[in-house]
Amino acid sequence: MRSSRHGRSNERSIMKAVFLVGIVLVVSFLIFFNIGKLSSTAAERVRDVSQSAVQQQDKRPFTQPAQQKQSDGKPKGKVVYLTFDDGPSSLTGQFLDVLQEYNVKATFFMQGSNLKNTGYQDNVKRAVEEGHYVGAHSMTHDAIKLYDNKQFVPEMLETLHLIRNITGTNPKLTRPPYGSAPGLKEEQIRDQIADAGIKIWDWTIDSYDWKLKDNPNKIVENVKEQTTEDLEVVLMHEKPQTLQVLPEIIEFYKEKGYEFAVYRDEEHFRLNFQKDNRL
């Protein structure tokens, strides 16, 4: 009888041990499963945060690295500024596409009457977001109003205000329609410009693209013939013929070893036909 009772006691002990081992295994599995799940969740959260940070960074306006300067404030080396007047237009987005494809930044001078067109404003915002500069080209592009009637400063301030409202930037640079010569030859109007804190930029190369609708190759020829200095500022317009040859113009400057630059208010240098250092 003792042997039988002793055997049954051993069986119960073994069963208890097996049961306890089973519980330990189940608990261990649950612990490791939850730890793995928590680790996976944490990793996903880290990945989501990282992706969000990258997306936010992508939305920040492009910042051009500061360039080395000469004593007159102009950049050193072979530098070209591509500039486009008379936008925004139905072509602005396509110009931005080409510039994006070539990773080139440009400077746009936009007209107030066009900026008021809400259908164009998304591309104005896009231009700034992608690192381009948007300056003013007056409200009316009317030489009599701007120069004879002395409305240059009021129109430019109004245009700059529109740009600020659309993009959130605070540009100071303007381009006088038809250039500062002869438009700004009177010192009185230049005094008004200086007092208003407005800056002026003309150009070093005139592509004459606006009158070459049926001869786009001549635009490229004009640009090539006039490219003679290390620093060049090319005047172009938002025209179909210009869009057509823009890749060729970009390739030309790349082959010549030019760096593409975009205007920055804090790095302004004098570039006006009147040679007025205040502007």
Where are these regions (language model features)?
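Detector for Asparagine
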Residues: 10, 34, 39, 48, ...
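Catalytic domains of cell-wall/extracellular-matrix polysaccharide-remodeling enzymes
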Residues: 141-254, 258-259, 265-266, 273-278
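Active-site beta->alpha N-cap acidic-glycine motif
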Residues: 53-147, 151-165
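Terminal accessory/targeting
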Residues: 1-81, 97-106, 230-279
